Amino acid sequence: DMTTDIGAGGNALPYRWRPMGFEYKGWSYVNERAIATQQTGFWFVGQSRHDLPDVVGGVIWFGTDDAATSYVTPIYTCTDKVPECFRVGNGNMLKYSPTASFWINNRVANACYKAYNIMAPTVKEAIDNFENEQMGSKLAEMDRKALKAYNAILPKAERKGLDSKDWFASVRKMLTEYSVGTAQKQFENWVALEELLLVKFIDGNVKAQNADGSFKHSKWHEGT
């Protein structure tokens, strides 16, 4: 557990910055590489559901930057448009863009690196809330809608020949809109999360919050 050895410092940081190697009393050592690493451009998990039609069954769970502090969002493989936050040319690894997923995930990750044991749990909770909702109800609901549309088209497509035209363009459009819309909305949520981290953990302090997420004020805050 790299959060517990001496290299983790006082904030249980599981990363070891470069250079990875060092010498001590004539012996050479090298730090292990964390499984989730800061040196990540993008990462994904492919999901193939054999019980669904091809146009519906393929999903790529796609994320950017450090896998420990970033989320994966579902992209149906039939999607024919790219979300703006993932668009090629919207910034790159050496050019900042405020509308790029890679860069907002970097902002969140680099905030956490300073006080990992205190800040990362807030990010992990946000990741779990989004991914569990998508893997639980949201994607299943979208699957049902797409499958219903697919089944309504299929009989006519089979009568006239499946190869005679793009019969399922409307299904693809539906799933593209879901993929793009979900990715962009979650990007915006991550922009808000980075702002929350700045306020909640400003100047080495942890601001208390009410049950609704708003910040608590002292009785002396009036007029300040």
What are these regions (language model features)?
Residues 1-224:
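C-terminus-biased signal that marks the final domain/tail of proteins
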